[in-house]
Regions:
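DNA polymerase processivity clamps
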Residues: 1-21, 43-98, 105-175
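Conserved loop-to-helix interface motifs that mediate assembly, gating, or partner/ligand docking
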Residues: 13-38
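Short acidic, glycine/tyrosine-flanked loop/strand segments centered on an H-E-D-like triad
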Residues: 28-32, 95-101
Length: 175
């Protein structure tokens, strides 16, 4: 991986009321790898929840384990962690909260159970400052898609392949 000396993004920030300003220049990375295309996918399971709740969930679970198992059955979702320090569960189900930020909407066409690395989820959760809502798109056949809709700007999507158990990895190696 090389850092380009000539290609960069520059951002200036000005606040006229407080007379504060800042300037940032981020060098773009020149990756010497092939681009991995991600096809448009119709995910069978989506979980729409508060992004601050997602951040808290990921942060708390990191103290217990390095991966989280997300299981969705019917319209209920359970996050499981288990490690040397202990174990934990967090339950979500559809609700009709008055505040949109407190609502949980689960759409499930197919029961799903997948494990993901918390190190990566914590990195992706940092985008919660850009949006109050996060949508998790889950499938046993495709990578997890974490979707933040950024008001008036667009969206930010992250993809994360599920973590394979030792049994699954050995079965795949035999094939």
């Amino acid at each position: 991986m090389k850092v380009s000396k000539y290609i960069f993004i520059k951002k200036n920030i000005f606040n006229l009321e407080t007379e504060k300003s800042g300037e940032f220049q981020l060098n773009l990375l020149n990756l010497d790898t092939q681009a991995l295309g991600i096809p448009d996918t119709d995910y069978p399971t989506t979980i729409k929840m508060s992004s601050s709740e997602f951040v808290s969930l990921c942060r708390d679970f990191t103290n217990l384990s390095d991966c989280v198992k997300i299981e969705v059955k019917d319209e209920k979702c359970t996050f499981f962690v288990s490690g040397k320090a202990g174990n934990g569960k967090y339950y979500l189900k559809n609700n009709n909260a008055e505040k949109i930020d407190d609502q949980v909407i689960i759409v499930n066409k197919e029961d799903v159970s997948c494990s993901y690395g918390l190190q990566y989820l914590n990195s992706f959760a940092k985008a919660s400052s850009l949006s109050n809502i996060v949508t998790l798109h889950i499938s046993s056949k495709y990578p997890l898609m974490i979707d933040y809709e950024i008001e008036d700007l667009g969206f930010l999507k992250f993809y994360l392949a599920p973590k394979m158990d030792d049994d699954e990895a050995s079965n795949d190696a035999e094939k």
